[in-house]
């Protein structure tokens, strides 16, 4: 991250590259830096709105893509496993590639990161639409959905890496960055709630129980053309949000210039920067812990709808349960931001544990009242699991910058490699879990699944997320976590960044 120099009168001498001595002048400069680093309410909201389309699309795919591929496209579970695994791996592989090219890109009139966000938008929208399109042929549907899911995940990565790294270039103030992150998470979740509501209401007619009651055949149910059209309409609604939200992002957010860009001296290569970041102990602990936690959340989301449809009598409550998860996540995000500021980030991590007993309860007692309680608690836990890593990453970057003489640009490597590892873990978790459905005898399009499939879904909704969350929290709790830099440390960090080398 690059921090702008503190305001000074014309002709004043430039600061020397050493820590300023404490005193009245230092305190005054600290207050001026704090005021200069403040972000307006409009900027924070517009920054959050920019991430809404990707979150809407990700939420729709998380809750409904697996069900769509199995029951509407009627692809065998083994092929669905390959589609999900290939798409996630494609998105994961795109992260270091995105970090490499973004760090080598030159600053333009709109910044260094913003052009990547703008350039990816139309292609993401097209890939997302065709992901939900049912082609007329049947033999190559697996290849069709693998292609477009891989394209969507890769393009979404090239959008998300610069968008999330933009947090470090909004302001030099750590507290304001945390606030911008909270605004982003809240606005994104509100958009996700709206998108999931619209998507779910549109496609609900494709999964009604009368679809099975109307036929006496034990084999797969014929897919109605109306069901495929409903998914296309839902996809088109999501596609429209991309140009609208990105326009607001460009109008309301200004990327700060990088004052160390013209600094002399050799640059740091991408591979050298990646080697440095992946050997930083606080970063390693953060990444490994959230490998398990994020994979648990993805498994819970992916199998909730399938569990309600095939392993319990909750198919009439699917929309209500999804909305409960998202509403509780949206409402609890501001509360978790207050907890982060008041009690610290490590303490807030215990909120993720709340999902564990309730996930087991849902698998054991799959009734409607229990399901709604579990959905509410899961939403609260998901909120903190999403907010916490993005709030801790800037502190990890600052901790790294205080220990190493390397300038701005490395923040993109931190963000891209974090997303790479979490996506890779999600790919493995979803791929293996979906393959387990194939081994248990899941039949695409069949109304009543075998008892082995029901047991497998209960394990996937209860035991698997529980083990992953416990493992992730144990790793996160070991050792100390980076603290928010003090005022003097922030001043030293700002001086070091202004006198250090930039990333080549």
From Swiss-Prot:
Give the way it sits in the membrane.
Multi-pass membrane protein
Please give the start and end residues of each transmembrane region.
Answer: 113-133, 150-170, 185-205, 233-253, 287-307, 320-340, 350-370, 373-393, 412-432, 459-479
Swapping residue 157 to A leads to an effect described as: Abolishes export of sphingosine-1-phosphate
Per the record's keyword annotation, is Transport included, yes or no? yes
Q: Where in the cell is it found?
A: Cell membrane
Q: Which reaction does it catalyse?
A: sphing-4-enine 1-phosphate(in) = sphing-4-enine 1-phosphate(out); sphinganine 1-phosphate(in) = sphinganine 1-phosphate(out); sphinga-4E,14Z-dienine-1-phosphate(in) = sphinga-4E,14Z-dienine-1-phosphate(out)
Chief subcellular site?
membrane
**What are the UniProt keywords, alphabetically?**
Cell membrane, Lipid transport, Membrane, Transmembrane, Transmembrane helix, Transport
| Chain positions covered by the region annotation Disordered | 1-33, 483-504
Q: Name one GO molecular function term.
A: sphingolipid transporter activity
Gene Ontology cellular component terms for the protein in this record: plasma membrane
Give start-end positions of Pro residues composition bias: 14-23
Transmembrane: is it a keyword of this entry?
A: yes
GO biological process, alphabetically ordered? carbohydrate transport; lipid transport; positive regulation of platelet aggregation; sphingolipid biosynthetic process; sphingosine-1-phosphate receptor signaling pathway; transmembrane transport
Q: Cross-referenced SUPFAM superfamilies, in alphabetical order? A: MFS general substrate transporter
The protein's matches in PANTHER family, at most eight in alphabetical order, are given as: MAJOR FACILITATOR SUPERFAMILY DOMAIN-CONTAINING PROTEIN, SPHINGOSINE-1-PHOSPHATE TRANSPORTER MFSD2B
Q: What does this protein do?
A: Lipid transporter that specifically mediates export of sphingosine-1-phosphate in red blood cells and platelets. Sphingosine-1-phosphate is a signaling sphingolipid and its export from red blood cells into in the plasma is required for red blood cell morphology. Sphingosine-1-phosphate export from platelets is required for platelet aggregation and thrombus formation. Mediates the export of different sphingosine-1-phosphate (S1P) species, including S1P(d18:0) (sphinganine 1-phosphate), S1P (d18:1) (sphing-4-enine 1-phosphate) and S1P (d18:2) (sphinga-4E,14Z-dienine-1-phosphate).
Q: Which family does it belong to?
A: Belongs to the major facilitator superfamily.
The name under which this protein is listed is Sphingosine-1-phosphate transporter MFSD2B
Upper classification of the organism: Eukaryota, Metazoa, Chordata, Craniata, Vertebrata
Which gene is this protein's source? Answer: MFSD2B
């Amino acid at each position: 991250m690059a921090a702008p120099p503190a305001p000074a009168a014309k002709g004043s001498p430039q600061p020397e590259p050493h820590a300023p001595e404490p005193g009245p002048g230092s305190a005054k400069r600290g207050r001026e830096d704090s005021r200069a680093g403040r972000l307006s309410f409009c900027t924070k909201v517009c920054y959050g709105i920019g991430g809404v389309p990707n979150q809407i699309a990700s939420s729709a795919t998380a809750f409904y893509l697996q069900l769509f591929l199995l029951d509407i496209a009627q692809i065998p579970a083994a092929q669905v496993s390959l589609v999900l695994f290939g798409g996630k791996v494609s998105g994961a592989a795109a992260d270091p590639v995105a970090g490499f090219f973004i760090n080598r890109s030159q600053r333009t009139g709109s910044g260094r990161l913003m052009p990547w966000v703008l350039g990816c938008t139309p292609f993401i929208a097209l890939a997302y639409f065709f992901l939900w399109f049912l082609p007329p042929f049947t033999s190559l549907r697996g290849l069709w959905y693998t292609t477009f899911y891989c394209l969507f995940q890769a393009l979404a990565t090239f959008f998300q890496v610069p968008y999330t790294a933009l947090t470090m270039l909004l302001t030099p103030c750590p507290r304001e960055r945390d606030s911008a992150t909270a605004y982003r998470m809240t606005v994104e979740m509100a958009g996700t709630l709206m998108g999931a509501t619209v998507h779910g209401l549109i496609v609900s007619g494709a999964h009604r129980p009368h679809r099975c009651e109307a036929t006496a055949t034990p084999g797969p149910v014929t897919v109605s053309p109306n069901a495929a059209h409903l998914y296309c309409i839902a996809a088109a609604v999501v596609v429209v949000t991309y140009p609208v939200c990105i326009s607001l992002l460009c109008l309301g957010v200004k990327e700060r210039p990088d004052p160390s860009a013209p600094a002399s001296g050799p640059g740091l290569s991408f591979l050298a920067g990646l080697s440095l970041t992946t050997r930083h102990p606080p970063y390693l602990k953060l990444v490994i812990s959230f490998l398990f936690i994020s994979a648990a959340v993805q498994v819970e989301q992916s199998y909730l709808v399938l569990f309600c449809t095939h392993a319990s009598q909750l198919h009439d409550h699917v929309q209500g349960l999804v909305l409960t998860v998202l509403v509780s996540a949206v409402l609890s995000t501001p509360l978790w931001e207050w907890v982060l500021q008041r009690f610290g980030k490590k303490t807030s991590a215990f909120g993720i544990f709340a999902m564990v007993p309730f996930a087991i309860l849902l698998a054991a007692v799959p009734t409607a009242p229990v399901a709604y309680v579990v959905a509410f608690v899961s939403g609260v836990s998901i909120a903190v699991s999403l907010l916490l890593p993005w709030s801790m990453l800037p502190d990890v970057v600052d901790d790294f910058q205080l220990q190493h003489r390397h300038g701005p640009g490395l923040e993109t490597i931190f963000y891209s490699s974090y997303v790479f590892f979490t996506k890779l873990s999600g790919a493995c978790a979803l791929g293996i879990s979906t393959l387990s459905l194939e081994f248990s005898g899941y039949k695409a399009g069949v109304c009543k699944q075998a008892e082995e499939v029901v047991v497998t879904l209960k394990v996937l909704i209860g035991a698997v997320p529980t083990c992953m969350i416990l493992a992730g929290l144990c790793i996160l709790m070991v050792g100390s976590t980076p603290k928010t830099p003090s005022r003097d440390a922030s001043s030293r960090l700002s001086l070091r960044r202004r006198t250090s080398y930039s990333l080549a």
